[in-house]
Amino acid sequence: MAGLKPNDFNWIIEGKLAVSECIGGAGLTPRKIRREEEIQWIKSQGINAIFSLLDSDFNLKNYQEVGFRTYHYPLADDVPMESLNIIFEAIKEALSDKERKLLIHREYLDEEVPGILAGYLIYSELLDDPILARTILEKILEKPLSPKAIALIPNI
């Protein structure tokens, strides 16, 4: 398989919704060659859309130039419920296209991202049990969700 798998890449919904840290690496000095290798790998997985939770529009133009559909929803450190619902709805709408395979990323796979993903599973009614959503994310990511992440899951 060509390319380089991004750090913290995991399928949340196999073949449909994935997560990773920022393509090309996190921090102030992402590497162009690494970004290109990771894009090649992501494309080999069939992913055709990037959903960025970064504060800036960093890399969005690069993603568009190589054919990705892009979404950008900057995420503050303290996420208000109104913002969560907007993000959940945007993910749901993006995934309503049966051909769309979406990668969600932020600089790092921090506390908020797992909570948003578990919350999306509840919001979209793919699951109806917040405890199960939390457990599934913990199993996929191989780490416990923080209290901050758990607080982002509806009905917990």
Residue ranges and their predicted role:
Residues D110-I116:
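Glycine-rich nucleophile elbow surrounding the catalytic serine of serine-hydrolase chemistry
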Residues M1-L103, I116-I156:
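Cys-dependent protein tyrosine phosphatase-like superfamily
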Residues R106:
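Conserved S/T- and glycine-rich ATP-binding loop of Class I adenylate-forming
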